[in-house]
Amino acid sequence: MPDPNRVLAGKKATLHNPNVSQQAKERAEDYIESHSSGQETGDYSAQAGGRDLDYEDLGDYDEDADFDNEEGLNVLGDESGFVDDPMKTGDLVEEDQLEGKNIENVRGGYKATMHNPNVSKQAKTRAQRALEEIDDETQA
């Protein structure tokens, strides 16, 4: 059973998170207003029969709340849900990105990406190209 104080803390964090939609912030604020009286001091009178009433708020979940801009792009990535890869533009691997890192660990990460069945073909292709670039740079 979730701790009501932690649920309230999460709702308060939602209010200050810049990656959360205005609609989600409004729902969090409504939740805080309706559930904070007495609970901050440890009074759990809002619970009925040991059950947490917090789950009632999930009934009006709006999937569009995760989209927070005019283009309809997910705040955590693009339309497909993938987060933009910072290595997508320009060189896949720049020397300053490798500086201070164990090159064999970097290579191992790319190799793991290529063999991971949960990774898209696009990511595997990028990993292959990055490995080729690393090999070219280390041989030069």
Swiss-Prot record:
| Disordered: region residues | 1-88, 110-140
By its UniProt entry, which InterPro entries does this protein fall under?
Conidiation-specific_6, UPF0654_domain
Biased composition, class Acidic residues, residue ranges: 54-71
GO cellular component terms, alphabetically, are: cytoplasm; cytosol; nucleus
Q: Which residues form the signal peptide?
A: none
Q: Please name one Pfam family that this protein belongs to.
A: Con-6
Coiled coil regions, renumbered to chain: none
Q: Polar residues: which segments have biased composition?
A: 34-44
Q: Which residues cross the membrane?
A: none
Biased composition (Basic and acidic residues) is annotated at 24-33
Q: Which family does it belong to?
A: Belongs to the UPF0654 (con-6) family.
**The protein's name:** UPF0654 protein C22G7.11c
Q: Which organism is it from?
A: Schizosaccharomyces pombe (strain 972 / ATCC 24843)
